Amino acid sequence: MAQQRVLPQSKETLLQSYNKRLKDDVKSIMDNFTEIIKTAKIEDETQVSRATQSEQDNYEMHVRAANIVRAGESLMKLVSDLKQFLILNDFPSVNEAINQRNQQLRSLQEECDKKLIALRDEISIDLYELEEEYYSSSYSLCDSNDLPLCEAYWREDFDMPSPESLSMPLTTATAEQSIATSQSSTPSHPHVNGHGAGPTDHS
């Protein structure tokens, strides 16, 4: 069996005051209502005139009705105070509500994560198929000089000058360039009878 929680002295006193207010208000309603019923009873004639007695009874009924209304308002205020007391001091219920809400949010988070993972897998598959389609169609439908992205990337790496060529002296590079230019500009003469044509003599 769960042990009964021991309330602090202030809370215990507060609950006792709530209990006393409840009993007093209910007793006030019952007493005033009973007196109103008694006042409605027609009594025998007394020394007081009937008109005076009617005014007195009318005033008494108004007062007791006001007391009933006041007691009812006090009970409504007591209900509000009890709700506030339970909300502020019922920590086990508050913790249980918080735990339930946390579990709901965790389950919702797990569901969202599963949906996101499934969506990621579908996108990956579609992306792979699109890449396969793109690379397979680039050879047959495009120009022969067009390369896939990966081959174009590596081709750029091969076409780039090496660090050694960048560090070569300017004179050496110029000399090599001039030799290549002279070789390309010298006309080649066909061999006649197995001998190459020599340079023409000028007189």
UniProtKB/Swiss-Prot annotation:
GO terms for biological process: regulation of transcription by RNA polymerase II. It comes from Gallus gallus (Chicken). Component of the Mediator complex, a coactivator involved in the regulated transcription of nearly all RNA polymerase II-dependent genes. Mediator functions as a bridge to convey information from gene-specific regulatory proteins to the basal RNA polymerase II transcription machinery. Mediator is recruited to promoters by direct interactions with regulatory proteins and serves as a scaffold for the assembly of a functional preinitiation complex with RNA polymerase II and the general transcription factors. Belongs to the Mediator complex subunit 22 family. It holds the Pfam family Med22. It comes from the Eukaryota. Keywords: Activator, Coiled coil, Nucleus, Transcription, Transcription regulation. One of its GO terms (molecular function) is transcription coregulator activity. One of its GO terms (cellular component) is mediator complex. It is found in: Nucleus. This is Mediator of RNA polymerase II transcription subunit 22. Residues 164-188 have a biased composition (Polar residues). The keyword Nucleus applies. The lineage of its organism: Eukaryota, Metazoa, Chordata, Craniata, Vertebrata. The keyword Coiled coil applies.
